[in-house]
């Protein structure tokens, strides 16, 4: 057996189930294999990209410059998706997310990356697309112009409504790649008025026993709360997406 560089077995130990090189020297791995890798780049969805002998690993929450321990979750012929287990050496890009639910929530992918590095990553992605896809090798992109305060800037959001395990009405955003709601009303990238609006709507639903929609049995009324703000005028539009012809007790909202 020829064990791969960076391979540390399953559950942290080397064993006979090690990732192998086949006879034609192609790297292979399988679910639950663990590796230590260096993250070299970021993908289009903000996931870290590392390589082992040309084989690509995509690692959520990893950053360029990180040295990490990962576990294979889904292996394909030329690439695999891996789970971040441990940050052995953090990247200079890494910072503490300002949002307390940034890791669970699927709304933001790069809050653990410094804002200056996020802007540099955007510039690099544009440059790569121009060079690799467009063939414009003689064009150089200028630095991305960022915001003075990179929070509370989005003017539109759609918040799903549901129930927690105790039967309480909750709203927030879906966890990544799921329809499980992460209860949170103080999103740092949405307009500050969103928090008060979500609080008002959920209170109205509780007081008037207006149900939230259940995706399993397709019953219930309120599915989403859509909020759009106009930065120039200060106007706010609130729409409730409902599973009914009329919204009960609308006059009390």
What are these regions (language model features)?
Residues 3-12, 16-253:
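Accessory RNA-recognition modules of RNA-modification enzymes
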């Amino acid at each position: 057996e020829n064990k791969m560089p960076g391979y540390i077995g399953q559950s942290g130990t080397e064993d006979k189930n090690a990732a192998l090189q086949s006879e034609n020297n192609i790297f292979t791995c399988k679910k639950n294999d663990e590796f230590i890798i260096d993250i070299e780049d970021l993908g289009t969805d903000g996931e870290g990209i590392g390589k082992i002998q040309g084989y690509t690993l995509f690692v959520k929450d990893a950053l360029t410059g990180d040295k990490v321990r990962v576990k294979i979750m889904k292996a394909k012929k030329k690439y695999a998706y891996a789970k971040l287990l441990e940050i052995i050496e953090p990247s200079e890009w890494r910072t503490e997310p300002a949002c307390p639910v940034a890791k669970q929530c699927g709304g933001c992918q790069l809050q653990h990356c410094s804002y200056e590095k996020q802007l540099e990553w955007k510039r690099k992605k544009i440059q790569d697309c121009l060079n690799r896809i467009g063939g414009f090798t003689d064009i150089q992109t200028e630095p991305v112009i960022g915001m003075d305060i990179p929070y509370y800037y989005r003017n539109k959001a759609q918040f799903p409504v549901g129930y927690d395990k105790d039967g309480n009405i909750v709203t927030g955003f879906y966890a990544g790649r799921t329809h499980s709601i992460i209860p949170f009303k103080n999103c740092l990238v949405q307009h500050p008025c969103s928090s008060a609006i979500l609080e008002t709507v959920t209170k109205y639903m509780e007081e008037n026993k207006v149900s939230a929609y259940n995706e399993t049995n397709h019953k219930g009324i309120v599915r989403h709360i859509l909020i759009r703000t106009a930065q120039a005028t200060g106007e706010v539009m609130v729409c409730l997406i409902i599973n009914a012809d009329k919204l009960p007790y609308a006059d009390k909202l």
